[in-house]
Amino acid sequence: MSEKIANYYKTVDFKRYSSIHIGPIKEVLVINEIGDYSDFQIIGRGNNLLISPKCEKKFAILGEEFDYIKDEDDLLYVGCATSSGKLLTYTRKNDIASLEFLAKLPGNLGGLVKMNAGLKSWEIFNYIHSIKTKDGYIKKENVDFSYRQTKIDTIVYEVVFHKTKGFSKDMQNEFTKMRDNQPQIASAGSCFKNPKGDFAGRLIEAVGLKGYRIGDMEFSNNHANFLVNHENGTFDEAITLDRQSVV
């Protein structure tokens, strides 16, 4: 039996680590033990994350002890440090259905669950049985979640999925195609949630902001709802662009 890994700190350069390639260098706690970390903000793989150079918050990520997949009977137990790519590969190799929408969706499982990630009508909570926090397992029906958000205010260490057979390569290919129009450069992902009955990207384009740029930050010409960094974008440029689009 392998020896348990303790918590430790590591230095993270958020200009390299975050998907938008903006941010300071900070010491980050790597959590390998279940406990109370209410003083820390969990950041996952740094997707949809924009950190001010003046930020004084304490950050943490889940470590190696929470990167696992356990297949038991009709349930799948997955640690929240597990990447979406690793989980998708496992379900494909083991002919497990329902998670094909993870194709080309970046991030670790913890972040995907926190924001109820998905694509169009597919979302991760559709397939969840329960989640595990420091207080134990919580059934899905006792979690407050909705479109692209949850009200989970604690760390989720593990997710339990319902398991059914029948992985669909056709569905995986369809989800891959749906995301092929997304920018391939540094990005914070979708900037605004879709309002009911419409699409944020369409609205941004309708008011003439598709391709609008301040410095190296831009609302992408490929997909208007994506805030992209052409190389040397700054926190202030990103915030100014966001605020101008809201105004």
Model-assigned labels for residue ranges:
Residues V246-V247:
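A short, hydrophobic C-terminal helix/tail in secreted or cell-surface proteins
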Residues M1-I43, N48:
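N-terminal, positively charged, Ser/Thr/Ala/Gly-biased leader segments
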Residues S98-H129, S187:
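A gly/ser-rich beta-alpha-beta helix-loop segment of oxidoreductase catalytic cores
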Residues H21-G23, E27-N32, L50-Y68, K114-E141, ...:
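Structural signature of FAD isoalloxazine-binding scaffolds in flavoprotein oxidoreductases
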Residues K15-S19, L49, K134-R243:
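Phosphate/pyrophosphate- and phosphate-bearing ligand-binding catalytic cores of soluble enzymes
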Residues G85-L87, N108-N116, S121-E123, I138, ...:
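Short, well-ordered, mixed-charge alpha-helical segments that flank or form enzyme active sites
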Residues N7-E27, F59-C80:
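Active-site-proximal helix-loop elements at catalytic-domain edges
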Residues I34-I42, E64-L112:
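FAD-binding glycine-rich core of flavoenzymes that anchor FAD
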